[in-house]
Amino acid sequence: MSFRIATRKSKLALVQTDYVIDLLALKFKMQCEKVLIRTEGDRKLDVSLDKIGGKGVFVKDIEKALIEKRAQAAVHSMKDMPNELLDLFEIIAMPVREDVRDVFISPEGIKFLDLPKGAVIGTSSIRRAVQIKNLRHDIEIVPIRGNIETRVRKMKEEKLDGIVLAAAGVKRLGMSEIITEYFNPFEFIPAVGQGAIGVEILKNSEYASTLGKIDNEDIRMGVEAERSFLKKLQGDCHTPVGAYSVIEGEILNITGIFQVGNKLIKKDVCGDKWDYIALGESLGEKIISG
């Protein structure tokens, strides 16, 4: 019997799952099959995420497949994962992290700072909206949901001046040519876990030892530092919060943003990468204290 991996049905989710499947085939000669799940977040594209339960809407139906033994593992975008998992589950591996940056896509190829006054940009991310406004107070923000292809289509149909997306998704779909420009990740802070793929299993799974061998330690430490920062702030998809971690040698640097009232606070900390959880918490405390 083949090893079953639960995943969303979107083209991007399938590309990410195929990456894990290829890795398992290469390292362990495992035969895998995909179990396709249409999540609540995929079904309710006309409703904002904060109204249907936040990030968990992309995860709960997939985790149900693990509980019901329809799949032995699941592949997720780490930025979609709730800050705290149920005790039943664990992220056993984070094998890869693509480009963490956000990108601006303009149908006319106009760069962000060159847009006309009052230009209209589509995003349903509060984090992106706040940072767009921080850079250009005159920009009008309109909500836009759906997969990458859908959002690009809506941008053209609704005659928007542009949209902001995650570079990782655009690149994984082989659509880099539509990118007008990349935002500097130190100036336009990405979402927690952006670009990282996570493999989730039930705790005490018989496959834990094998799947753990595809984990990338530095990627995990960086993402977990960002997640501990988010947890300290009790942030979620309703909150303008972002974090960006970089590991150089044994040093981890993490930069975070959080909006308090109308003020966008940005801080950073650095230290020994093995203290990644404490570093994330320290950054949260630093931002809370102003």
UniProtKB/Swiss-Prot annotation:
Cofactor comment in the record?
Binds 1 dipyrromethane group covalently.
Q: Does the keyword RNA-binding belong to this entry?
A: no
Positions carrying S-(dipyrrolylmethanemethyl)cysteine = C237
* GO cellular component term, pick one: cytoplasm
GO BP annotations of the record are: protoporphyrinogen IX biosynthetic process
- Please give the catalytic activity noted in the UniProt record: 4 porphobilinogen + H2O = hydroxymethylbilane + 4 NH4(+)
Select a single GO molecular function from the record's annotations and give it: hydroxymethylbilane synthase activity
Alphabetically ordered keywords of this record:
Porphyrin biosynthesis, Transferase
What metabolic or biological pathway is this protein involved in?
A: Porphyrin-containing compound metabolism; protoporphyrin-IX biosynthesis; coproporphyrinogen-III from 5-aminolevulinate: step 2/4
Which SUPFAM superfamilies does its entry note? Answer: Periplasmic binding protein-like II, Porphobilinogen deaminase (hydroxymethylbilane synthase), C-terminal domain
Q: Does the record bear Ribonucleoprotein in its keywords?
A: no
Which EC number(s) are documented for this chain?
2.5.1.61
Note the PROSITE patterns from the entry. Answer: PORPHOBILINOGEN_DEAM
User: Which cofactor(s) does the record list?
Assistant: dipyrromethane
**Cysteine disulfide partners in this protein:** none
Q: Which Pfam families match?
A: Porphobil_deam, Porphobil_deamC
Function in brief: Tetrapolymerization of the monopyrrole PBG into the hydroxymethylbilane pre-uroporphyrinogen in several discrete steps.
Q: Which family does it belong to?
A: Belongs to the HMBS family.
Tell me, how does this one assemble?
Answer: Monomer.
Q: What else is known?
A: The porphobilinogen subunits are added to the dipyrromethane group.
What is the name of the protein in this document? Porphobilinogen deaminase
